[in-house]
Amino acid sequence: MAGFGEPGIDTVDAAGLTVGVVAARWHGELTDHMLERAVAAADACGARSVVARVAGSVELPVVAQALARRYDVVVALGVVVRGATAHFDYVCRSVTDGLTRVALDEGKPVGHGVLTVNTIEQARDRAGLPGSAEDKGWATTVAVLDAALAVRGLARTTQRVGFDA
């Protein structure tokens, strides 16, 4: 069940942080709205956002990497709908692996706001449209800003913990 156990963080105080948002153009009705919601979430949290667009979800990781080199956090948005071939699996895996690699290689939080769904109706229900059950553009942005604040807090911690403390 999507949304079950969701943390329910509506906004965080991310004043001074910068957000690079990259959104795919496939399924533009949905990704355009998700992009609007991501930018609105960044604004509501006090962060400044910059937007880049790419053709499809496969192109998200390389642009996310370029954004991660310039901005505090990255949000990647897209929609991948399962079809009759294995292409869905390859796209979803490469996008997920790529975005994870960017986050780890660059040491920056990267929000995975790519809807990987079986039907376009499932995507609509998660895209933050009027009547949607979920708003992944907003939620992904707030989550990645929250992660950036956690990383920043850890960087300020001088007390050592663990076996070597």
Curated annotation (Swiss-Prot):
Keywords: Riboflavin biosynthesis, Transferase
GO biological process, one term: riboflavin biosynthetic process
Gene that this polypeptide is encoded by: ribH
Disulfide bonds: none
Binding-site positions, (2S)-2-hydroxy-3-oxobutyl phosphate: A84, T85, R126
Enzyme Commission number(s) from the entry: 2.5.1.78
Gene3D superfamilies: Lumazine/riboflavin synthase (3.40.50.960)
Designated name of the protein: 6,7-dimethyl-8-ribityllumazine synthase
Residue numbers annotated as active site: H87
Organismal lineage: Bacteria, Bacillati, Actinomycetota, Actinomycetes, Micromonosporales
Top-level enzyme category: transferase
Protein's job: Catalyzes the formation of 6,7-dimethyl-8-ribityllumazine by condensation of 5-amino-6-(D-ribitylamino)uracil with 3,4-dihydroxy-2-butanone 4-phosphate. This is the penultimate step in the biosynthesis of riboflavin.
Family: Belongs to the DMRL synthase family.
Pfam family, one: DMRL_synthase
Reactions listed under catalytic activity: (2S)-2-hydroxy-3-oxobutyl phosphate + 5-amino-6-(D-ribitylamino)uracil = 6,7-dimethyl-8-(1-D-ribityl)lumazine + phosphate + 2 H2O + H(+)
